[in-house]
Amino acid sequence: MASGVQVADEVCRIFYDMKVRKCSTPEEIKKRKKAVIFCLSADKKCIVVEEGKEILVGDVGATITDPFKHFVGMLPEKDCRYALYDASFETKESRKEELMFFLWAPEQAPLKSKMIYASSKDAIKKKFPGIKHEYQANGPEDLNRTCIAEKLGGSLIVAFEGSPV
């Protein structure tokens, strides 16, 4: 079901910047986004970047000790959101970083909001080619490390964001 909602150019630019890892200086790496939250504009016609709802790679270890916990804390309790999260995890063989796309639709969100976000999900996903991991979370219990590790590769995952699972 299409909603007719558009996706802002800035959303596409942020996705591209997060997906493409070009050789960068240490300062440029610190400015790269670790997580970004997107919301609907006030008129509900466009998906935009939510002001102030991002984590920069340079914040991790400096002002943010647990980036995933901080990311979960940025999600509203009673409304829906989309998000991109640059997940760092380890398998038994190697260390990996992959983008995850989230639809956050908590139980307490208004029904109309859930319907608009669900019906607009395809519009934003089409702007994010190559996303390997898509996840819908309906409450904080869906966003624990075990659930995310399962989504990323199940028993092959030994650590997520530096913490054992």
UniProtKB/Swiss-Prot annotation:
The keyword Acetylation applies. Keywords: Acetylation, Actin-binding, Phosphoprotein, Ubl conjugation. ISGylated. Residues 4-153 form the ADF-H domain. GO terms for molecular function: actin filament binding. Widely expressed. Not found in skeletal muscle. One of its GO terms (biological process) is cell motility. CDD domains: ADF_cofilin_like. The modification Phosphoserine is found at residue 3. The modification N-acetylalanine is found at residue 2. The keyword Acetylation applies. It comes from the Eukaryota. The modification N6-acetyllysine is found at residue 19. A motif (Nuclear localization signal) lies at residues 30-34. Pfam families: Cofilin_ADF (PF00241). InterPro entries: ADF-H, ADF-H/Gelsolin-like_dom_sf, ADF/Cofilin. One of its GO terms (cellular component) is cortical actin cytoskeleton. SMART domains: ADF. Belongs to the actin-binding proteins ADF family. Actin-depolymerizing protein. Severs actin filaments (F-actin) and binds to actin monomers (G-actin). Acts in a pH-independent manner. This is Destrin. It comes from Mus musculus. The lineage of its organism: Eukaryota, Metazoa, Chordata, Craniata, Vertebrata. The gene is Dstn.
